[in-house]
A protein has these predicted regions:
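Secretory targeting and sorting signals
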Residues: 1-26
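Primary mode marks residue(s) on the alpha4-beta5-alpha5 output face of response regulator receiver
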Residues: 26-60, 64-187, 194-304
């Protein structure tokens, strides 16, 4: 009898522990991501670069622009903001930022991404709760058109290099891509800001990459880590594929922040600081109970 009572007591205790563990295992507390997406179409091409070659139209290799519809060699923060709500190819009408990268060619034919591209805003540091929004007007260049293959391969921003089909970690374009596939590239930006300069002489040194998941003392301010994930609709023989800047390892991109500050702050707070895997509305489909940062019109609640 005593044995049966002891077994019953143990069973009750185990059941209680399991119940408490299950109740405490709220999926909302299981942090595996801290990011949101920006989805934008390529909207124009120009031989301009308002960060590296400001006010010099035609002086650059050709870039494909996404985001703000008005970006050109004369672009400033004021001109991006003056474009007005909705003057963007991105889903969020209040993201008036400009994003651009070298145009890809197959021979002499431009290879233009023909659907919305993905730009991730992530935490680049371990303490994702500390990430803060970009200041208005912050701008920088990621990568370099003058990189060597080894520099591109060893760059702290590389993810998987160029990829297509089952071929990954290519630091120049692969020789062939399976028919019907796309040529993809993913590249991460530095996410630590020096807290003073919106730009620098080389358009890079005011930013830094984290070291072991922590911002260095020279650049102590954590901001979102951009990760461009661009898909080019080209496959087959890649021998004639090139970038306007040169070989595949010359890949680089530019960012000029012109977000509406309250909108960016809401997305950073809800998705990055909140430990969510958000879509462009700031909604995590795996944790729907957490809600969305933006309305169905991709604007802050209450904005038409």
């Amino acid at each position: 009898m005593r044995r049966h009572l002891a077994v019953a007591a143990v069973s009750v205790a185990v059941a209680a522990l399991l119940t408490n563990w299950t109740a405490g295992a709220d999926p909302a507390d299981d942090v595996t991501h801290h990011e949101f997406q920006v989805n934008c179409d390529v909207n124009h091409r120009l031989p301009d670069d308002p960060i590296v070659l400001p006010n010099l139209p035609g002086a650059s290799h050709e870039h494909s622009f996404t985001g703000n519809n008005t970006t050109n060699a004369a672009t400033t923060l004021a001109s991006l903001q003056a474009a007005g709500v909705g003057a963007t190819s991105c889903l969020a009408p209040d993201d008036l930022s400009a994003y651009w990268f070298p145009t890809m060619f197959n021979g002499n034919t431009p290879v233009i991404p023909n659907f919305k591209q993905v730009i991730y805003y992530k935490s680049g540091i371990i303490r994702y709760q500390d990430v803060r929004p970009f200041p208005p007007g912050l701008r920088y260049v990621v990568g370099s058109p003058n990189s060597t293959l080894d520099e591109f391969r060893n760059h702290p921003g590389h993810v998987e290099g160029w990829e297509c089909g089952d071929s990954f970690f290519n630091w120049d374009f692969p020789a062939n891509c399976p028919a019907g596939t796309q040529l993809n590239v993913r590249f991460q930006a530095p996410s630590c800001w020096n807290g003073r300069d919106l730009d620098s002489a080389d358009h890079r040194s005011h930013m830094a990459y984290p070291v072991d998941g922590v911002c260095p003392s020279t650049h102590p301010n954590p901001v979102p880590m951009l990760e461009f994930k661009i898909a080019f609709p080209v496959s087959g023989n890649m021998s004639q594929v090139r970038l306007a800047s040169g070989r595949g390892y010359s890949w680089h991109y530019d960012f000029f922040n012109a977000w509406d500050p309250p909108t960016l702050a809401a997305l950073v707070s809800h998705c990055i600081n909140g430990g969510l895997q958000c879509d462009p509305r700031g909604f995590d489909q795996y944790k729907p109970q957490r809600g969305a940062a933006l309305g169905t019109n991709y604007r802050l609640p209450g904005r038409p």
